[in-house]
Amino acid sequence: MYMTNPHVAEPIVYVIDDDQDICNSLTWLLDSVQLESKTFNSATEFLNYQRPHTAACLILDIRMRGMSGLQLQQQLNQQKINMPIIFMTGHGDIPMSVNAMKAGAFDFLEKPFNPQHMLNQIQSCLQKAELDFVEYEKRNLQLSKLKSLSPRENEIINLLVDGLSSKHIAQMLNISHKTVEIHRTHIRQKLGTESIAQIVNMVLMCREKTLQVMV
């Protein structure tokens, strides 16, 4: 059985397929290993659903009426929604599956799928989703700490990230070296860091991932 991280809410497996029999069989399969799931018969129905804030993955049919699985993947990517996807494909959909993998899909399985293999892939996919979610929450905490800085502290931290010394920062901002050191102490206290290297790493990580969301 899949073991969840005790510090994270129960993960969810979303199943999207316009074939209700597929949805039912996957629901039964996931229930058999006590995995929470929710099914949808269209991509639009999924997009309109108010998703809880937790780790999740998608089991997605690549061909559906209305918005296709590929189109949904593209929309999620455009919205910076980070949710690993396992595509279900029919015979002859291999070229589409290759495109899906290039766009970041976790895997694709051809119908009819082997139940145990599907479960194995879902468990691997959920492990990735949970790790991503923990990292996302950590980054959110870092962002909230950065937002607590004063305008002057923000000026100084950006100059520190650019590699300037306290002496050069003092000259650039027309303040004393001692004042810069006081601000640096306040910055370390607010961010919970012990060194300039940790501060720089936090800022660069948040800059890189600011636009990414989970659900």
What are these language model-derived features?
Residues 1-14, 20, 141, 207-215:
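Non-catalytic signal-transmission and effector/linker regions of two-component phosphorelay proteins
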Residues 93-95, 109, 113-122, 168, ...:
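C-terminal output helix
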Residues 188-215:
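Basic, Lys/Arg-enriched C-terminal extension of HTH/homeodomain DNA-binding domains
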Residues 62-64:
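Receiver (REC) domain active-site loop signature in two-component systems and cognate sites
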Residues 41-42, 68-71:
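Acidic catalytic/metal-coordinating carboxylates
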